[in-house]
């Protein structure tokens, strides 16, 4: 089968790999669509992120969907021909965090397309993926291109779960990449009264508008605009920080009301924070990492049409044009979510 393999920064190759044999409880999924994630771009551009580095060739990809081609004899939950989204989260289910109901914090997580462990966990950008049947969420309406959005949407659903109720809240979203745009869509679905989104590029802000943002602010052109929400100790109930930028976080703290919540979703470096403000305003600052059980909900919402994420899709490329696809995904002015078709 064909696979998209990263060897080093900018060294992306289409290689033949053997299809694994089916084991008990497993299925073979013929992959049809795969979304390029920010982590895929980090491997492509830099060979990793933070302290995580490529140490061997690795198949990229974890935002994947396709059709079941074959099932093991003991599999009953899916059948050949089913269209499915594949959950890339594979916790061990027996470590102390799994046993406490925190599978996203699993000590032995085998998340697709990850160079954290050695050997690396190979990803899903391949013609055929053999996986556990329990990883497959069956869909009846949505095409594979929409179902491949379930993984990043699950990330966002988990983050908003960390935020608490959004009903009637004014929500600020800082950073409008694919995750920030999905936060906008999910916040609207969760009953936010007003959604303000900020970025330094106009094009992704236009997509956020289509997904439900009430106000989209280019802070490069209007650097002082968010500050107007700082009156009377702050007018924002919930802030979701998606940029990983210290200035965005600090600026957001100025406008979040007392006892408001800040969810840190974007990955960045170490930052210094005004602790006196955290104390005086009794701010709740929480992190959000990956997802697990939210994946099934994400698939259900997409498949039933209760939420429309198609404005996020800005480009598709056949897998043989993987280099062009990654180049397009790198251009924030022309692309939000780029997908590969297999």
Where are the predicted features?
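Adenosine-nucleotide cofactor-binding segment
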Residues: 173-176, 186-251
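Helix-to-beta-strand junctions that scaffold the AdoMet/dcAdoMet cofactor pocket
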Residues: 256-257
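N-terminal Rossmann-fold NAD(P) dinucleotide-binding loop
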Residues: 180-181
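Rossmann-fold dehydrogenase core element
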Residues: 261-263, 273-312
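Short glycine-centered segments of the SAM/dcSAM-binding site in methyltransferase folds
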Residues: 83, 170, 260-261, 284
């Amino acid at each position: 089968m064909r696979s998209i393999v990263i060897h080093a920064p900018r060294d992306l190759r289409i290689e033949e790999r053997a299809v694994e044999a089916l084991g008990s409880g497993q299925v073979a999924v013929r992959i049809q669509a795969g979304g390029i994630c920010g982590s895929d771009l980090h491997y492509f551009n830099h060979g990793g992120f933070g302290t995580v580095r490529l140490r061997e060739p690795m198949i990229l990809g974890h935002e994947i969907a396709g059709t079941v081609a074959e099932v093991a004899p003991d599999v009953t939950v899916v059948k050949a021909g089913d269209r499915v989204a594949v959950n890339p989260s594979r916790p061990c289910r027996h470590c102390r965090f799994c046993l406490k109901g925190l599978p996203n914090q699993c000590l032995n997580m085998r998340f697709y397309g990850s160079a954290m462990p050695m050997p690396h966990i190979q990803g899903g950008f391949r013609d055929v993926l053999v996986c556990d049947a329990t990883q497959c969420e069956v869909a009846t309406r949505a095409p594979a291109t929409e179902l491949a959005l379930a993984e990043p949407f699950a990330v966002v659903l988990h983050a908003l779960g960390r935020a608490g109720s959004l009903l009637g809240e004014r929500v600020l979203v800082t950073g409008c990449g694919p995750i920030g745009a999905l936060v906008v869509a999910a916040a609207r679905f969760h009953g936010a009264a007003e959604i303000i989104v900020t970025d330094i590029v106009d094009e992704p802000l236009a997509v956020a508008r289509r997904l439900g943002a009430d106000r989209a602010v280019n802070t490069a052109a209007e650097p002082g605009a968010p500050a107007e929400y700082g009156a009377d100790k702050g007018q924002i109930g919930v802030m979701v920080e998606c940029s990983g930028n210290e200035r965005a976080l600090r600026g957001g703290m100025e406008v979040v009301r007392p006892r408001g919540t800040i969810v840190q979703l974007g990955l960045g470096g170490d930052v210094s924070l005004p602790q006196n403000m955290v104390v005086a305003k009794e701010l709740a600052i929480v992190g959000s990492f990956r997802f697990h059980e939210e994946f099934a909900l994400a698939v259900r919402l997409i498949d039933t049409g209760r939420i429309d994420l198609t404005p996020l899709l800005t480009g598709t490329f056949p897998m043989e044009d993987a280099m062009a696809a990654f180049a397009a995904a790198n251009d924030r002015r022309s692309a939000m979510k780029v997908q590969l078709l297999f």
